[in-house]
């Protein structure tokens, strides 16, 4: 077993959305079927199986023979079925293990979802804002963000999924041989995957709301770059990132991460600076101080 000082980082973290479900094909299915019990359609099964082939090609395509996979899966029927189909592409010796993880489940839309009511609710969400709007008797995207990352509930500290994932890696709970490339595959839902990316890359709410949802059976590859930073741009093209809704600044940030040295790279966070400090002058502190003194004198005269 690896000691904490021998921490071996995953080479890839792959986020997968489930295949087409009954609810995707016919939204009225939610009127009578609980969301966690919604099944895949035949097309969804085919999409999931194809995703497995493509994911294996991503992992094995670089020529390495020393690689293993570990799966995390949402407890919903459609994600569990997606995992079973993806798993057909991997032999048992390649799979370290699998864990059902409730914190990466679908956003709670409020029990049975009668379509006439949901249409009104979703129109209200568009006006209110997709991230902060909380469905009646359900969750907001911000609530999903909290359980995917971490949060405090009164005096009880609740670990988010991402925090638990890193603790698994740190303590080698995955029983991973450090000589093998480790690939973590997270089979989940569109929103849970997008807030995972938001947390990972420290994106703002405004940036999150630019993102397009994953297609059914689609995946994103977060891969370790040459300098030790994770990035979407190691595997994916600029065109793909733009198509998924990333702004040009966000794409440029991913490209920096892909080649930056972990010790030298600092997050420039230009979007934070521009959002909060666009009114500040570019001159040095001395000139700013003199300007402030002049303003003070003029106010006193």
What is each model feature region?
Residues 1-12, 31, 61, 88, ...:
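Acidic, low-complexity terminal tails and accessory targeting/binding regions
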Residues 2-94, 137-143, 148, 301:
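Active-site-proximal alpha-helix that buttresses catalytic centers in soluble enzyme cores
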Residues 12-16, 72, 178-192:
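Beta-strand elements within well-structured catalytic alpha/beta cores of enzymes
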Residues 66-70, 95-99, 180-184:
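Residue-level recognition of the N-termini of beta-strands and the immediately preceding loop/turn
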Residues 21, 192-193:
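Short active-site segment of divalent metal-dependent hydrolases/proteases
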